[in-house]
Amino acid sequence: MKILSVFFLVLFFIIFNKESLAEKTNKETGSGVSSKKKNKKGSGEPLIDVHDLISDMIKKEEELVEVNKRKSKYKLATSVLAGLLGVVSTVLLGGVGLVLYNTEKGRHPFKIGSSDPADNANPDADSESNGEPNADPQVTAQDVTPEQPQGDDNNLVSGPEH
């Protein structure tokens, strides 16, 4: 322990002496004195060039104003694009909903309107609703009564029995 303390004390004195010797040599040669200290003692010029600082501040302020203008243009453009994206997504979601609804009902995917079975069964209903009566309505017996299957009815499969 005593050896370590002696060793550290010797190192401390060596470092301290080097610094003190360096200061003494700088004072003698005059090379250790900074230029700011020379200006203070010698002439009446200020240490800081105020005109350069003011011109730098003005340039930075102009750059900030320019950046803010660009940011405002980008902000407007992004808000317009966001609005358009909202409209497009709304239209797409509505179209997907319409297609899903119509396919579930068994209609054409893009049909808009009522889903009356009478409209789907009678394609001539559109012409009658327009005020154009059919000149030759030909109704046959097959149109009125559906065909009955011929043969044994026991071969037909019914749901609750099987």
Swiss-Prot record:
Residues 120-137 are annotated as: Epitope (deduced). Residues 137-162 have a biased composition (Polar residues). This protein is addressed to a new compartment within the cytoplasm of the infected red cell. It also surrounds the parasite, probably in the parasitophorous vacuole membrane. This antigen and the circumsporozoite protein appear to have a common epitope. It comes from Plasmodium falciparum. Its main location: membrane. Residues 114-130 have a biased composition (Low complexity). Keywords: Malaria, Membrane, Signal, Sporozoite, Transmembrane, Transmembrane helix. Residues 1-22 form the signal peptide. Changing residue 160 to T: In strain: Palo Alto17 and 3D7. It is found in: Parasitophorous vacuole membrane. The keyword Protease does not apply. It comes from the Eukaryota. The chain crosses the membrane at residues 80-101. This is Malaria protein EXP-1. One of its GO terms (cellular component) is symbiont-containing vacuole membrane. It holds the Pfam family CRA. The keyword Ion transport does not apply. Residues 109-162 are annotated as: Disordered.
